[in-house]
């Protein structure tokens, strides 16, 4: 019965294209915490006017009452006109009500659309320990390993070994597409298998996922496929977009469901190709495999109770750290500043590896606590043991982003004779080979 009600509710939302239960932040919460929501939006750099939103929502509620009152009057007149010949006065009243109701309904729809448009741009509230400022204001939390220096650029090295071909990739698909060949392709597979083995041992259930999602799923997860500067490839003429990360289909896995408290947390890991336009990345570190339009990735994802999410955030981070410690990479963990957070995240950690080529830190993986933001966007809830129902919390984290992982290994395990040392933990997945 509950699933049926969810489907009915979803159909109504699809018809109207306005679904207040699917707003990323609850309007009631925004009303009761207007200053906090406005400050958080400002800290994240989102141009949202909460006062305007609440004023429009007041208008919406007033119009809703007017529409309901007019509908009651219409129904009353219809009842009086049944069973006998109606007098002209009732007919005239009915005609006038029809005009007034259509007018009010039109105003209501227009106001609802304005409210919904603003609500979609209200970002999640940040945690109190998130640093203020932009990218340069993110704070180092911890560091691991010793820095190396003096390595050859990963692209020059890989090309010299005959392992990567961007020229032929560009010939068949355009810039930033590539072929991996021989031992480097095998090394990518080795990293994947190693990471998958480790992550599943930590309690994450492995899933393969759709490589496309509908726009509701993408938007509910906090992505904007049709927004300005979007990173997603939208399928023309279809309600579909290619995924930029397995986070998108994993978020949608439990859409419009009510989960049982006893089953949480649910931990998943999804492997998929990722497709990104990489709009707005010019001037950043983009050479070679570091930033491309297509790459493979193993993603971790969690659905949990609100009181579990901070602990699970640390768990996901610890899994990411353990993977790179075992491979043997120097890195640090950064608490990302508010101005560099996306809309869904209340807090995000980045792991940045030490590049011996550039002699600086470069982004490697990230993990985010999105609290109930995505869950509200896709109507994912939990029934408590006392019968109450509320939104779950969701979290995501990169186990390994394969193209970037290869950059890290190519930079850190080169030898003077031109060979590459295979990290010890990867050797069982490379037929026992120590060097390639």
What are these regions (language model features)?
Residues 143-436:
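TRNA-recognition modules of translation machinery and tRNA-sensing kinases, especially anticodon-binding
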Residues 21-145:
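N-terminal alpha-helical targeting/anchoring segments
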């Amino acid at each position: 019965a509950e699933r049926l009600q969810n489907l009915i509710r979803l159909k109504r939302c699809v018809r109207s294209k306005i679904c207040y239960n699917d707003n990323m932040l609850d309007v009631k919460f925004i009303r009761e915490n207007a200053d906090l929501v406005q400050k958080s939006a400002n800290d994240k750099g989102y141009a949202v006017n909460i006062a305007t939103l609440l004023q429009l929502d007041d208008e919406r509620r007033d119009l809703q009452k007017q529409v309901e009152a007019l509908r009651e009057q219409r129904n009353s007149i219809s009842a009086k006109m049944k069973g006998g010949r109606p007098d002209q006065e009732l007919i005239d009243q009915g005609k006038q009500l029809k005009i007034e109701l259509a007018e009010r309904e039109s105003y209501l729809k227009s106001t609802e659309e304005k409210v919904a448009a603003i609500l979609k741009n209200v970002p999640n509230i940040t945690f109190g320990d998130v640093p203020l400022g932009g990218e340069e204001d993110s704070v180092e939390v911890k560091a691991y390993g010793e820095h190396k220096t003096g390595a050859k650029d990963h692209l020059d090295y890989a090309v010299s070994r005959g392992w990567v071909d961007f020229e032929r990739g560009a010939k068949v698909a355009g810039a930033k597409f590539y072929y991996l060949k021989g031992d480097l392709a095998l090394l990518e597979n080795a990293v994947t298998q190693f990471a998958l083995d480790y992550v599943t041992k930590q309690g994450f259930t492995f899933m393969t996922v759709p490589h496309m999602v509908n726009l509701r799923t993408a938007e509910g997860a906090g992505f904007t496929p049709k927004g300005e500067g979007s990173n997603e490839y939208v399928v023309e003429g279809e309600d579909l977009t290619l995924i930029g990360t397995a986070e998108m289909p994993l978020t949608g896995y439990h859409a419009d469901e009510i989960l049982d408290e006893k089953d949480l947390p649910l931990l998943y890991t999804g492997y998929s190709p990722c497709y990104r336009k990489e709009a707005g990345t010019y001037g950043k570190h983009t050479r070679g495999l570091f930033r491309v339009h297509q790459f493979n990735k193993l993603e971790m994802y969690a659905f949990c109770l609100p009181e579990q999410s901070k602990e699970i955030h640390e768990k996901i981070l610890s899994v990411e750290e353990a993977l790179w410690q075992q491979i043997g990479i120097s890195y640090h963990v950064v608490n990302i500043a508010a101005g560099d957070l996306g809309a869904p995240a209340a807090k995000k950690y980045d792991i940045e590896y030490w590049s011996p080529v550039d002699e600086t830190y470069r982004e490697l993986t990230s993990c985010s606590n999105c609290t109930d933001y995505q869950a509200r966007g896709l109507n994912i809830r939990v029934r408590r043991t006392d019968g109450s129902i509320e939104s779950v919390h969701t979290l995501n984290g990169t186990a390994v982003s394969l193209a970037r992982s290869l950059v890290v290994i190519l930079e850190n395990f080169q030898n003077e004779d031109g060979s590459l040392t295979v990290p010890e933990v990867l050797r069982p997945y490379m037929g026992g080979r120590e060097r390639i």
